[in-house]
Design a protein with these regions (language model features):
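Short glycine-/small-residue motifs
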Residues: 120-123
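Vicinal oxygen chelate
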Residues: 1-8, 28-79, 88-114, 125-134
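Conserved active-site tyrosine of GNAT-family acetyltransferases
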Residues: 17, 21-22, 91, 118
Length: 134
């Protein structure tokens, strides 16, 4: 069985979403098969950005409405990086918000962030054997 994981992220503006994810993490836009949907590749995953209006309903049977200010969700991306400070700098320059940095020299440091659309993600520094940064 062959499996592929695709991560789908709602954004209020497709062009801004593509700009952020390509600049922050090096994704490349592969297709825009229909209006309001962009397919990006990078980091060994396929990322689909879906343009969805703020205030629209995310599914039938819920009173929830889409909102793009910072929000909590039980699902987020962990992006493992060799150089945390460089990756964090690129993400912030592209529009990410750094919320907290957790320094752990023995196991790898991490930065808790959100994208410009309120979705949380973590940057986690890879460590080599012996505890040194990768």
């Amino acid at each position: 069985m062959t499996s592929t994981v695709t991560i789908s992220i709602d954004v209020p503006n497709l062009e801004q979403g593509v700009l952020f994810y390509t600049r922050a993490f090096g994704f490349t836009k592969k297709a825009e098969p229909i209006p309001g949907l962009a397919v990006l590749h990078g980091l060994n995953v396929e990322l689909c950005l879906l343009e969805k209006a703020p205030g629209s309903r995310p599914s039938i049977g819920t009173s929830d409405l889409r909102r793009y200010e910072r929000h909590w969700t039980p699902v987020h991306m962990d992006i493992h990086v060799d150089d945390l400070q460089s990756a964090l700098g690129r993400a912030i320059e592209a529009g990410a918000v750094k919320e907290q940095v957790f320094e752990n020299p023995e196991h790898g440091s991490a930065a808790f962030c959100s994208d410009p659309f309120g979705h949380g993600f973590c940057l986690i520094e890879r460590r080599k054997k012996g505890g040194a940064a990768a």
